[in-house]
Structure formats: structure tokens, C-alpha cells
Amino acid sequence: MRRIGAITALSLPVLLSLLYSCGTGGSASKEEILSKKEHNPEPNIPLECYTDTGVVKLGKAIANPCYVCHTKALTPYENEVDDFDLQLVYDFPEEIKEMGNPWLNAIKPELTIGSVPMPSDEEIKTWIRQDNWSKAYAEKGKGELVYFPDIPPIYKYENGSYELINVDKEGFVRDPETGEYTGWRVFKWKPFPGFFPTNGRIDSTFIRLPEKFRKKNGEFDLNLYKKNLAILECAMKGVAPGETCSGTEVGDFIMPFRYEGDASDVEVVVYQYPPGTEFAHPLYYLDPENTLSFKSLRIKEMRYMKKLAYADTRTGTGEEEEEEGTFFWDKGRFFNDSGYWEMRAFIEDKNGYLRPQSPEESKFCIACHGGIGGTVDGTFTLWRKIPGEEGWKEQDYKNIKDYRYKAITCENLDSLEMGEEVKKALEAYCSKVGESPGEYTVYFALTAGGDHFRSNYEILQDISVDGKVDLELLYNPEKIKFIDNSGFIKPELFFPEPERAYGIDKQYYRIVKAQAFIYGRDVFEKAFGISSGGNSLEELDNLESTGVKESGIWNFVKNFLSSE
């Protein structure tokens, strides 16, 4: 019998029937439907999608965090979809409507992790400074870790301090034994709105192109590899063959129609990674003592993607549902919904060692990489890379500008597809500043906070001079506090205070010890459901409109960023 804390083999349906059976009516029919599934039937719908915009608690929407993911498709390929309608309606499957919000770690954590004691400060510091990456790296290709990626750890912790290892000054990852180039390269990108360390999201991102992209006449050529990476970066940012690719580490050049060197047989396709492109994506705990990046030695997860083929252009809506029973899984290896990416995912076991994610846990990854409007080729990263040499280094959350949306300029506001309240606020901003606002400025204003859940009160003091965050940020841009006099985002925006950082670590540690990932990976200081005073929806059966259309805060523009 599987145990989650002191709860003996209680499946998600049973837990939810207990939660929602008192005074709600219809509990028998819910239980009948839920008994058909052991756990969450739709783990690919993340907790963010269960956020109350205000329409439930206040009777009207005051926030629209949905627009950053669900919008006009950024590209014409099958990897993305026009799903902007999901800003307007809560479109949950019937089974989810019947069962209610399945992410119990957010709304009822006492049922899932309540029996796991909160670790002390010293216990959590000891935990996060232990190395579980090296062990997994040493065992790659064997047993349960047969698909673990061949990328070595990049930090060590000795004598009370952190040091970056196995990464050179240009971001190339070196073999820890031979010092040779592995092909992996770390890069820095503007974090996706809300996915900040202060919200519990901290990571590194690595890319590797196939061997022939690194060779000329069969010999390794570092300068050639840099050029091919620059070509790819510009292609992902929308620069077509024949146009000028500018601001790269190798200078400005005319975009070729094919990659160079031994990869000259591979066509350059705008908005598409060439087949064989790999990504590695470790997720960390927060450690304020790491002054390099705030990242812990221990990693929570290792995620991996490999491109299989160039994607076809969309011919339908792109939202056709995957047939039941077609999900492939083998020791943490699986494929995203479009089938153009192989994915792998590893997460901590209760002792902190990395193990393959289960099929249900793996489907959680497809939530964001399975085909939404706000990605490019199913990813969030390289098209958001910091330009030039500054972008080829480990993510340190420094020297990042609040790059603007290409689609929003002061000259084209009348033609944009967005609500009247948003448009009026942007007009006010333009009239005062003379240029359109940055991406984060728009996000904070539309989200009425610094995260999708409106749960992080600490960040509000870093965003605004008076701690109030809403559309007034656009009407009164002098309230903006998170940008310095040189136009860069102040690093303190991204980081929580040490006490809160370790508090986030502690709550996640409890999920690890309970092995309760199927109930969610986001952590809050206390239960965050509507009934507990939070903003996570609980019951869904009578919910339709998000209210953002009625409140005039919808936004259907593509979220590509400018480089200025």
C-alpha cells in the first residue's frame, strides 16, 4: 500500500470526494466518475490554469496571467496553437470539472504532506548543499538512469562557499576528467514572466547541437560552432535567411539558407531547431549563500529535450486531443504531444537521489511543452536569450533589460487585439514615456502581482514604489521601481529574502519526503485555495468565463521580444 504521509493509499478521487462532499451536492456522481481514475486524469493542465482571476472571489476579473501562455501562436508550426480563447474561459475537461482542482498540495496540503515535519534551518541548509547530481551523472546510461543526460554538475560547495565548475568563461561545458568540449553550452535568457527565483523557480539551461554543427571537414572547430549557434539564435528570434543577423558574439552577418561546416546539408528554418538539438534543464533549490546565482548544490529535477524532426505547418486548430492509451514512457523517457520532441525527466526520491519521473509525473512536463501559443518550437528559452556574449554564461539574473514586446508599439495601439482597459493604460504610458512599456511592466500590470497566483507579497515592494501593483503601473510609470537608471532590471526583483527562500525550500522538501509530486510542485506558506483565502480555484463545475473580457483586460498579441 502506498503511503503519503499518514494517509494510507488514499487516491486523489477519494481525497477530493472528502473535500467537496460537505454541502456541495452531487458528491455521489463525482465519486462514481473519480473512481475510474487513480490520480489526476489531466496532469498536463498545470496549477496556473486553476487561478482565480478575481471573478470568483470578487465577482469580476482583476488579473489576467493567462495571456503569457495562451495567445496568438508565435509561429505557423504544429508545435504552437492559437489558444487565446483560454484567456476568456475556464475550459476544463468534464472529468476535471466533476472532481475539482486536483493539485492538493496547493489547496489542501495538510492531506498530502501534513504528516511530514517541517525541517529546521540547519536541516534544510544541509539538505540543499548535498550533491545528488554527481551521483546521477556517474550512473548515467545504467539501470533506472539509462536515459540521464551526459551533462556534469556545474557547482561545488566547499568550506562554506560555492564555485562554478566544468563551465568555461564562454559558457562551454567541459568534461570533468579530460577538460574537452562536450558540446553543451549554458546560456542566459530573460526568465519567462513570473518564473522567478522569488516564486520558487530557479534553473540553468544548456543547449547542444549535433556533432556535425561543431565540425568542419571532420575536425572540431570552436569558431564554426559559435557561428552555427549564432545562426540558430537569430533563426529562433525570427531572422530569416537573407536578412541581417546582428548583435551576436561573432558579429553581424547575413543569415544563410543552410548551416555551416559539416552541417551545410541542414536547412535553416525560422522558428525551428534543427533535428538533434538537445536541451538540458536542471532545477534547483534556493540558496542565498550562493552569491553567484542563488542556486543550491542539490537539484530538484533534471529535464531534457531532443528535437526529432522539423515540424509541419499547422493545418487545423492544433488542439486535437491525444488518444487515450497512446502515451509512451520508458524510465523517464517520453514524447511531447506534437511528437517532435523526445523528453526525459528525473526527480528526487524520498532520500534525495534522482529517479525517473513516473508516467503521471512526466505528463506534468507536457503542460508547457505540449503545444501552447506562447512558445517557439515548444520551448521558452533560446528565443529569449540575452543578446551577444552576455547571453552565453550561467544564468545569474544580472544585466537583463525589460525587453519590450515586438507587437506593442506606441504607433500601433489602435490595431492591437486587446481589451479597452489595457489599451487605455498603454496609451497613458506612451503619452508619458514616449515608448511602449517592457514585457515585465505589462505582465505585472495585467497580473496585478509578481506571479501567476498573486501569492508573492514580498515582490510587490520591489515592483512598485508604493507596493501596489495593477494597471496603474502603466498609468503612472513613475511608480515603477524594479528598473534602474540604466534600463536594467534590478537583480533584487528576482530574489526572495533569505528567510523566505529557505521557507520555500522547506515546503518543497516536505513534498519530496512524502513523494507527493502528483499533487503539485508549487509551494505556498499555507493552503492557497479559495476557501482558505488564496487564489487557487477548488470547485469547477459551475465555472465558465474568466471575466477578463468583461473587465477589458484581455490581450491577444504575440509575445516575441525586441532586442532593445
From Swiss-Prot:
Residues 1-21 form the signal peptide. It is found in: Cell membrane. The keyword Lipoprotein applies. This is Uncharacterized lipoprotein aq_1262. A lipid is attached at C22 (S-diacylglycerol cysteine). One of its GO terms (cellular component) is plasma membrane. PROSITE patterns: PROKAR_LIPOPROTEIN (PS51257). A lipid is attached at C22 (N-palmitoyl cysteine). Its main location: membrane. Keywords: Cell membrane, Lipoprotein, Membrane, Palmitate, Signal. It is a lipid-anchor.
